[in-house]
From Swiss-Prot:
Reactions this protein catalyses: S-adenosyl-L-methionine + H(+) = S-adenosyl 3-(methylsulfanyl)propylamine + CO2
pH influence on activity: Optimum pH is 6-8.
Temperature remarks: Optimum temperature is superior to 90 degrees Celsius. Thermostable. Retains full activity after 3 hours at 70 degrees Celsius.
Oligomer status and interactors: Heterotetramer of two alpha and two beta chains arranged as a dimer of alpha/beta heterodimers.
Name under which the protein is recorded: S-adenosylmethionine decarboxylase proenzyme
Pathway linked to the protein: Amine and polyamine biosynthesis; S-adenosylmethioninamine biosynthesis; S-adenosylmethioninamine from S-adenosyl-L-methionine: step 1/1
Gene encoding the protein: speH
Source organism, top-level taxon: Archaea
InterPro entries linked: AdoMetDC_C, AdoMetDC_fam_prok, AdoMetDC_N, S-AdoMet_deCO2ase_core, S-AdoMet_deCOase_pro-enz
Activity control summary: Competitively inhibited by methylglyoxal bis-guanylhydrazone. Inactivated by treatment with the imine reductant NaCNBH(3) only in the presence of substrate.
EC nos: 4.1.1.50
Length: 124
């Protein structure tokens, strides 16, 4: 039995390919492929291209979300990969993200969300 409700990766990616960070169609495909890789269920994807550069996007999942915000001028991307349930693995999404953005360094904050005391959960 799960001792927590969800797994949440907060990702800091530096030294990314600036062209990939500014490629809105590529980012949308990366989000969709990330959802498939981690075993989640896609509800919808929304992206937005900024002028003169940069993008933001979110994949809304039945199990939570994957979100990205890019800064091509710094070679930087900030991402959240938050999944709930035993059947999902956010680290599988990270493999897809790494392949597309090609970061030179990655900082990962790995959170367990909805921690349950002794494996039980009670709403008050």
């Amino acid at each position: 039995m799960l001792k927590y409700l969800g797994k949440h990766l907060i990702l800091e990616l530096w030294g990314c390919d600036p062209k990939a960070l500014d490629d809105i169609e590529g980012i949308e495909k990366m989000l969709v492929d990330s959802v498939k890789a981690c075993g989640a269920t896609l509800i919808c994807v929304r992206t937005h291209k900024f002028s003169p550069q940069g993008a933001t996007g979110v994949a809304v999942l039945a199990e939570s979300h994957i979100a990205i915000h890019t800064y091509p001028e710094y070679g930087y991307a900030a991402l959240d990969v938050f999944t709930c349930g035993e059947h999902t693995d956010p680290y599988k999404a990270l493999e897809v993200i790494r392949e597309f953005l090609k970061p030179k360094s990655i900082q990962i904050i790995d959170l367990k969300r909805g921690l349950m005391e002794n494996g039980t959960f009670e709403l008050k």
